[in-house]
């Protein structure tokens, strides 16, 4: 999944309950995942991120190292998000249990990684359902009736 992210051409949509200062392999180096994302944005890729809670200080430090992220990363915080998905160029989708963390998709050692399961497919009906679920949250379709509005700083709706 991480290797596929680096090759996205136009659209990358990521949904995760938890996000941390994830590190990944890039060529022969280990780099912050946010460096990979910043490179995509520099190439003109639209990157959308939905996550459920504010990341910790290490993530924020990495985020601040790449100024393009503050300007062009499209981001929504929704405390009700528990899905984990990555949509690649609106043609392929990963849906599974792995959060955007070292133990989920990153480089934690074999003895410390989580046991994850997921599906990576380009089956049109599966990808369409993933896109629809992502859009449902992204567009604020549930916000008006949501019981957790007070915890949601990014709702697109004004109450």
Regions found by a protein language model. Name each.
Residues 84-87, 117-119:
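Short beta-strand scaffold segments in enzyme catalytic cores
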């Amino acid at each position: 999944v991480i290797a596929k992210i680096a090759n996205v051409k136009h659209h990358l949509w990521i949904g995760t309950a938890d996000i941390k200062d994830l590190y990944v392999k890039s060529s022969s180096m280990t780099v912050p995942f946010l460096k990979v994302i910043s490179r995509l944005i520099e190439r003109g890729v639209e990157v959308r991120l939905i996550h459920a809670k504010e990341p910790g200080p290490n993530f924020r430090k990495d985020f601040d190292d790449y100024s393009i992220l503050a300007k062009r990363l499209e981001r929504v915080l929704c405390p009700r998000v528990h899905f984990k998905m990555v949509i690649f160029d609106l043609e392929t989708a990963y849906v599974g249990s792995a959060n955007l963390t070292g133990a989920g998709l990153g480089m934690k050692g074999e003895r410390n990684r989580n046991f994850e399961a997921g599906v990576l497919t380009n089956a049109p009906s599966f990808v369409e359902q993933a896109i629809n679920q992502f859009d449902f949250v992204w567009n604020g379709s549930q916000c008006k009736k949501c019981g957790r509005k007070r915890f949601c700083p990014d709702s697109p709706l004004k109450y």
